């Protein structure tokens, strides 16, 4: 077993005792850091940054040099999987990600390959191995993927969407085609995450960014069902240590009980869910991650500290809390505000652990 100097993040996910509440930030390697912007400029574009193991490692480590974070998260993108399926990912200025060959019908789904994670996605595994080597056991490394439903929204819509009318048209008019796509994605994501674990990821997270746009019935059928399949197929032990799994559905606070039934170790919460209520409902089964509004980082440090104190008190005494934002950090947040946030979590949380 590789020695970890700081394992409180992994311990908290497994609801084991810790000295202080661990903290990391979604998108902690990102555009709010001037050093990230410099490295991205060096890479040329976003996907070139993802595909260069040394540069992906560099941006993964940048926030850890600034802040005493309790975990590193692989620098990559959820759309690596559809890109490896041959959809032709590109980034349009001001538009976000686009695909040259979106999925429009069952015939398109039938043609999609299931990517070999050590081949078409080998650059991700190289990044995982490089980051693990450079972390030198300081903190654990989180691997991740998008959920099948969330990946499918981009693949069917052809990119980002506000109303999701194209994928919902497929969902209601041709559900068989969508189920075939989601099944293929579930298989691909399972292989992809297991390859990340074998390459050195010590915990994995499934980001279901767009599950919250569904009705409860559709969420169960088209999103949660496929995340459950992935959880069932994941390696849960590696290098002599349990590999915790976190599910995060943005806008999914009403479905926590169903999510906790999947066998995952932890649930991510966005900022619209009350953490005290979430703990009452599912804290006996899973750890909770979250859940400060990312926009709170625009506030003065004293106000950030008050919010941290409120969320810590909401979760209360005992184990099973990983502090995070309720979604990714915004790109124009002052870096010193992120520092005040991390420092406040550690300083104010010790009283809740004894």
Swiss-Prot record:
GO terms for molecular function: uroporphyrinogen decarboxylase activity. Its main location: cytoplasm. It catalyses: uroporphyrinogen III + 4 H(+) = coproporphyrinogen III + 4 CO2. Keywords: Cytoplasm, Decarboxylase, Lyase, Porphyrin biosynthesis. Its EC number is 4.1.1.37. Pathway: Porphyrin-containing compound metabolism; protoporphyrin-IX biosynthesis; coproporphyrinogen-III from 5-aminolevulinate: step 4/4. GO terms for biological process: protoporphyrinogen IX biosynthetic process from glutamate. InterPro entries: UROD/MetE-like_sf, Uroporphyrinogen_deCO2ase_HemE, Uroporphyrinogen_deCOase. It holds the Pfam family URO-D. It comes from the Bacteria. The keyword Lyase applies. Substrate binds at residues 27-31, 77, 154, 209, 327. It is an enzyme of class 4 (lyase). It is found in: Cytoplasm. Disulfide bonds: none annotated. Catalyzes the decarboxylation of four acetate groups of uroporphyrinogen-III to yield coproporphyrinogen-III. Homodimer. Belongs to the uroporphyrinogen decarboxylase family. This is Uroporphyrinogen decarboxylase. It comes from Salmonella newport (strain SL254). The gene is hemE.
């Amino acid at each position: 077993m590789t020695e970890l100097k700081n394992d409180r993040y992994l311990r908290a996910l497994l609801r084991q005792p810790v000295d202080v509440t661990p903290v990391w930030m979604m998108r902690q390697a990102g555009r709010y850091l001037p050093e990230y912007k410099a490295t991205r400029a060096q890479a040329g574009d976003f996907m070139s940054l993802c595909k260069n193991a040394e540069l992906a490692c560099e941006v993964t480590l940048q926030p850890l040099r600034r802040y005493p974070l309790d975990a590193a998260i692989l620098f990559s993108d959820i759309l690596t999987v559809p890109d490896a399926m041959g959809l032709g990912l590109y980034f349009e200025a001001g538009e976000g990600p686009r695909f040259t060959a979106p999925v429009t019908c069952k015939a398109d789904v039938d043609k999609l390959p299931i990517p070999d994670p050590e081949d078409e996605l080998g650059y991700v595994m190289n990044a995982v191995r490089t980051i693990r080597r450079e972390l030198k056991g300081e903190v654990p490394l989180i691997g991740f993927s998008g959920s099948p439903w969330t990946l499918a929204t981009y693949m069917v819509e052809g990119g980002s969407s506000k109303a999701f009318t194209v994928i919902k048209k497929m969902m209601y008019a041709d559900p068989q085609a969508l189920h075939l796509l989601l099944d293929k994605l579930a298989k691909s994501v399972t292989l992809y995450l297991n390859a990340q674990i074998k390459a050195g990821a010590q915990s994995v997270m499934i980001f279901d960014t767009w599950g919250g746009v569904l009705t409860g019935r559709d969420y169960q059928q088209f999103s949660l069902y496929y995340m459950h399949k992935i959880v069932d197929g994941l390696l849960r032990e590696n290098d002599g240590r349990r590999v915790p799994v976190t599910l995060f559905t943005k806008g999914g606070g009403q479905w926590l009980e169903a999510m906790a039934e999947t066998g995952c170790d932890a649930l991510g919460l966005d900022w619209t869910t009350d953490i005290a209520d979430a703990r009452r409902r599912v804290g006996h089964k899973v750890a909770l991650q979250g859940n400060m509004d990312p926009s709170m980082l625009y506030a003065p440090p004293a106000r950030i500290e008050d919010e941290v104190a409120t969320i810590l008190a909401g979760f209360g005494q005992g184990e099973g809390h990983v502090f995070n934002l309720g979604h990714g950090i915004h790109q124009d947040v002052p870096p010193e505000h992120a520092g005040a946030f991390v420092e406040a979590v550690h300083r104010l949380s010790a009283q809740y652990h004894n």
